[in-house]
């Protein structure tokens, strides 16, 4: 239903076909899904004003870290229009790449122009001349860096602000949309030590906190169970959810260092990012080539 269209969720229309292509190197998925990829970005484009996607009822950075009694504004709120613009630009970029692969030259030119306008609008609306973002959150810097939305000269500074934010809180604060990318962004910009600190933190909120509470599945919330063993009183509590399990992607691709250097792993790059906390690490990747 159009009233429930949400950035990040709806963008599976572009993200999944592209990831499938990168994993298997099979253009048929892109060929089959190309019409729906275009329909998604065309619809979002129809909802923009001045190239900004700010309409709608997006979920935002779902279940990000927040304080119950937030009198000093420390909850990690990333404004929803910011997130929407990030994913709008990202989906446009994926459609451009797909159009080029499929030989749709007119489409590629059309969506490339839209992508440039979306990025320019993002920078004008949400980035200060000094590279600060309107939402000073881990998710904001993560998405802006992951999707290459900042000018090259501002990216290193933004990565440093992301690290400063992590150090200021002492833990992760991202929700569903920032969590899949934060450790990758940190590693790409030379802060893999900070990514490992997030991975190995055992205090709430963290990946290892649920394990310390006996969890054998991924929770929907960082604090679905409280330290006293009581279930979170929030009406929406799931003890078997997918989102924060996205750290597994970073473990394979960055910690163990198994990445495709060409679609379908026709070429593979092996570059582990090591850490003193591990004496060994083992991983394997099944590909169309073995």
Language model regions located:
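Long, charge-rich low-complexity segments
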Residues: 16, 25, 143, 190-193, ...
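Non-catalytic C-terminal accessory modules of carbohydrate-active enzymes
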Residues: 113, 193-290
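Extracellular polysaccharide-recognition and catalytic grooves
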Residues: 128-236
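Zinc-dependent metallohydrolase catalytic domains
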Residues: 120, 180, 280
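Well-ordered alpha-helical segments within folded domains of soluble proteins
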Residues: 7-19, 81-96, 137-148, 175-187, ...
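Active-site acid/base region of carbohydrate-active enzymes
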Residues: 1-4, 8-11, 23-86, 99-146, ...
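Generic, well-ordered alpha-helical scaffold segments in large soluble proteins
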Residues: 16-23, 40-43, 47, 91-98, ...
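Flexible loop/turn segments at secondary-structure boundaries
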Residues: 61-64, 182, 205-207, 277
């Amino acid at each position: 239903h159009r009233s429930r269209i949400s950035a990040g969720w709806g963008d599976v229309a572009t993200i999944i076909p592209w990831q499938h292509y990168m994993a298997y190197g099979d253009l048929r998925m892109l060929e089959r899904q190309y019409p729906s990829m275009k329909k998604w970005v065309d619809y979002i484009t129809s909802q923009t004003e001045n190239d900004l996607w700010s309409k709608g009822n997006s979920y935002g950075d779902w279940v990000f870290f927040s304080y119950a009694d937030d009198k000093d504004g420390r909850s990690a709120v990333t404004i929803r229009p910011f997130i929407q613009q990030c994913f709008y630009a990202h989906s446009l970029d994926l459609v451009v790449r797909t159009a080029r692969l499929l030989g749709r030259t007119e489409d590629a030119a059309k969506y490339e122009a839209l992508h440039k306008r979306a990025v320019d609008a993002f920078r004008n609306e949400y980035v200060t001349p000094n590279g600060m973002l309107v939402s000073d959150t881990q998710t904001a810097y993560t998405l802006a860096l992951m999707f290459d939305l900042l000018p090259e000269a501002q990216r290193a500074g933004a990565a440093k602000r992301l690290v400063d934010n992590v150090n200021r809180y002492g833990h992760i604060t991202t929700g569903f949309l920032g969590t899949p990318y934060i450790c990758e962004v940190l590693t790409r910009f030379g802060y893999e030590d900070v990514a490992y600190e997030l991975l190995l933190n055992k205090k709430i909120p963290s990946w290892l906190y649920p394990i310390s509470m006996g969890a054998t599945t991924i929770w929907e919330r960082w604090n679905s169970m409280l330290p006293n063993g009581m279930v979170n009183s929030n009406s929406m509590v799931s003890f078997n959810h997918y989102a924060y399990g996205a750290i597994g992607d970073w473990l394979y691709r960055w910690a163990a260092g198994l990445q495709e250097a060409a679609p379908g792993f026709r070429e593979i790059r092996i570059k582990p990012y090591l850490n003193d906390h591990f004496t060994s690490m083992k991983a394997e990747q099944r590909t169309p080539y073995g």
